[in-house]
């Protein structure tokens, strides 16, 4: 049977109207792994939609929640976002009031440069816990990333490299499918290798969403407090979809994918999945329900992880 989903190049810049970049700003320790250049590693990424997008998110249920997660929890309630700034090498977690100020400063700078409301900019961080962000580096990195922001394939590659920490390879995918008589594209990037056990919900609180299919024995513990390091995922799509339907679809997709993963059983303070849907595919919003859209989201989420 022929699949309705076609894997295509482009990752997060495959959908219409999305730009990305990944740069070096020296947050990470010097290294020679993927994304390194003369001993440096990319450690700051931008994902930007050319138009305001519908947004949905799923977040860690760890009682210790990092400032970037708290910021996203507040802002996704509005249902609209247009840009995401992500840094690696520092989780900005357990950093007190300064951590909150730094998360706000990251998004405020990007919003000013892109001439959009601060509420439309989201943030993600991963890396060392308990250390404040080197904001001079972060701010310089944001300005640098804006100069190379583009829809070129290498820009998506640079973005996924910039969110990696202990990952041994980049995790990214893009798919194309028909929806409402229009061709729709969806792309995703993800990071997370050792010490992960995502247990995410839309509110950052338990209980977790229930998988549509019967859970495995290990998944039956979803009501317990998992012993959860950081899993980040960012998905872009040019589908037009209402915020309520996107939230429902993402909850189902995460329940059937990321919330079933465990490596060493460690949950992060920063686990986050964000989806931006900018509507540029031109399909009718009224034809999409959460249950219909969860299938491509589930496939994209599951396909990000390399075999």
Describe each model-derived feature in a short phrase:
Residues 64-75, 100-114, 247-260, 298-307:
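Short, well-ordered amphipathic alpha-helical segments that serve as non-catalytic structural scaffolds
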Residues 54-77, 167-175:
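Glycine-rich oxoanion-binding loops at beta->alpha junctions
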Residues 104-105, 109-204, 224-255:
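Glycine-rich, mobile lid/loop segments that gate access to catalytic sites or pores
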């Amino acid at each position: 049977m022929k699949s309705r989903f076609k894997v295509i190049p482009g990752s997060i810049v495959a959908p219409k109207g999305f730009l990305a970049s990944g740069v070096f700003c020296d947050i990470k320790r010097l290294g020679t792994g993927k994304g390194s250049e003369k001993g440096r590693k990319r450690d700051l990424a931008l994902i930007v939609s050319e138009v305001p997008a519908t947004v949905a998110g799923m977040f860690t249920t760890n009682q210790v929640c990092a400032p970037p997660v708290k910021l996203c929890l507040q802002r996704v309630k509005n249902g609209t976002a247009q840009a995401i700034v992500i840094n690696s090498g520092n989780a900005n977690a357990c950093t007190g009031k300064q951590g909150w100020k730094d998360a706000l400063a990251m998004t405020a700078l990007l919003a000013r440069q892109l001439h959009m409301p601060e509420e439309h900019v989201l943030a993600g961080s991963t890396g060392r816990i308990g250390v404040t962000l080197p904001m001079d580096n972060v701010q310089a990195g944001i300005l640098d990333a804006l100069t190379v922001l583009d829809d070129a394939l290498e820009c998506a590659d640079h973005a996924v490299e910039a969110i990696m920490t202990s990952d041994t390879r980049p995790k990214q995918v893009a798919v194309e499918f028909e929806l409402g008589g229009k061709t729709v594209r969806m792309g995703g990037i993800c990071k997370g290798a050792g010490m992960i056990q995502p247990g995410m919900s839309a509110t950052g609180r338990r209980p977790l969403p229930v998988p549509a299919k019967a859970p495995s024995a290990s998944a039956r513990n979803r009501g317990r407090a998992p012993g959860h390091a950081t899993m980040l995922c960012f998905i872009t799509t040019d589908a037009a979809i209402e915020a309520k339907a996107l939230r429902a679809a993402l909850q189902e997709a995460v329940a059937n994918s990321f919330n079933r993963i465990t490596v060493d059983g460690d949950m992060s303070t920063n686990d986050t999945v964000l989806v931006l849907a900018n509507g540029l595919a031109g399909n009718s919003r009224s034809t999409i329900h959460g249950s219909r859209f969860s299938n491509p989201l589930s496939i994209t989420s599951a396909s990000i992880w390399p075999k």
